[in-house]
Each structure stands twice: as C-alpha cells, then as structure tokens.
Amino acid sequence: MADATEKAEHDRIFKKFDANGDGKISAAELGDALKNLGSVTHEDIKRMMAEIDTDGDGYISYQEFIDFASANRGLMKDVAKIF
C-alpha cells in the first residue's frame, strides 16, 4: 500500500497525463505525455495501453493507473522526476 507521499505523487502524475481532466487517460493523452520522455512510437503506446488498460475499455482509469504504479514503483520514481 502506498503511503500519503506516494499517493500524492501518483495523483499528481495521473492528473498530468489526464490532460482534459475527465478522470481517465486516453491513448492520445498517454502519447502526448510520453513525448516528454523521448521518442515513443504508436506501437509503444498501443503496447502500454494493452498492459495498463486491464478492462479493455480504451482508457486508463485512475485505479488501473494506481495498480500499474504499485507494481512498477521504480518506473514511477523515474516518471515522477520528469513530471
């Protein structure tokens, strides 16, 4: 379970990725956010969406994001440094 600081960091990153503020991250929003990390291909985005979007609705919900973040703490620390 994440502590309060980690939760706040996850919230901040989720909001950064959720550009339109609708509470979910679309493939387009994911791609736009990942451009800050360097070159990312359409295939990279599709692969990430398939991995993180566990219910297959085409969006990354907050819970799916948190589940992914909890399972990938090292990656999330790197992402937090950039965002």
UniProtKB/Swiss-Prot annotation:
Binding sites annotated in the UniProt record for Ca(2+) 2: D53, D55, D57, Y59, E64
Protein residues bound to Ca(2+) 1: D18, N20, D22, K24, E29
Keyword ATP-binding recorded: no
SMART domains: EFh
Pfam families, A to Z: EF-hand_7
Domain EF-hand: start-end pairs: 5-40, 43-75
Keywords: Calcium, Metal-binding, Repeat
CDD domains per the UniProt record, alphabetical: EFh
Repeat recorded as keyword: yes
Source domain of life: Eukaryota
Cysteines engaged in disulfide bonds, as pairs: none
A GO molecular-function annotation: calcium ion binding
GO CC annotations, alphabetized: cytoplasm
Purpose: Potential calcium sensor.
Protein name per its UniProtKB record: Probable calcium-binding protein CML28
Taxonomic source organism: Arabidopsis thaliana
Name of the gene this protein is made from: CML28
